[in-house]
Amino acid sequence: MKTILDQCQWPDLAAKYDSALRSAVGFIAENLEPVGIIASGTILRGNPDPASDLDIYVIHRTAKRQRIQKFFDGIPAEIFINPPEKIERYFAEEQESGRPLTAHMLATGFVVLSLDPVVEALREKARTRLTQPPTTPPQLIEMARYSAAATLEDAIDLKERDPAAAHMLASVCIVRMLHHVFRKANVFLPRDKDLIEAIRARDPELASWAVSFYETADLKVRLELAGSIADRTIGVRGFYEWTSEPVE
């Protein structure tokens, strides 16, 4: 009878990553009952950074979910363990949040193990999800917009009394403003480490302002740049009137 490892397929990876992935799958086979294992992330895509980890998605039939973070042969790995029903719920939730992380892992990852038709069925659903726009409710988008504006206003208020807090809040609001560019366009949010490059592809001048903001320590300059970024993205620099829909 074939073992789980006998039924695995392996991607073409650099030796250290290949060894780590095989060790991780061995750990999974020994401790879980997988019907599917999918490896994804920058290591699999061939463009890892020095601290990149293996992203490994495990599909099992047990009605439990778990996350394991563990080193294998010196390489960090994040292991996500879920039953099919939970995965489908993640698809819907992440479509609404604008960050389809689960769908992206399943659709673009390498199938190391597939012992059940549900693996390919989930991958097909994931691919379909990625062709569809986010389902973020307009009210949540407006709340995020207001949060960015209010945070900038707080940063400006604190520039004399508490400069450190002003620096902190200004940094927070810039990320929210840049996210609004994608929410307003009804497209998925990029990963945080890809955010500035994704902005540059849409608006090079806006990206240059963001880079200048993060590269300067001068609070006055930072707040001036934050104001320009606010004007370009959320269109407001502080409190504004709006009304949410009534809910029970």
Regions found by a protein language model. Give the residues of each.
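Catalytic metal-binding acidic patch
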Residues: 37-82
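Generic structural marker for isolated residues within well-ordered, non-membrane alpha-helices
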Residues: 25, 66, 178
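Amphipathic alpha-helical interaction elements
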Residues: 26, 111, 214-218
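Conserved NTP/Mg2+-binding pocket subregion across the NTase superfamily
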Residues: 2-13, 68-160
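A positional/architectural concept
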Residues: 25, 35-36, 45, 89, ...
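Conserved nucleotidyltransferase catalytic core and NTase-mimicking acidic/glycine-rich helix/loop elements
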Residues: 3-4, 130-248
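Helical scaffold of the NTase/Pol beta-like nucleotidyltransferase catalytic core
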Residues: 1-35
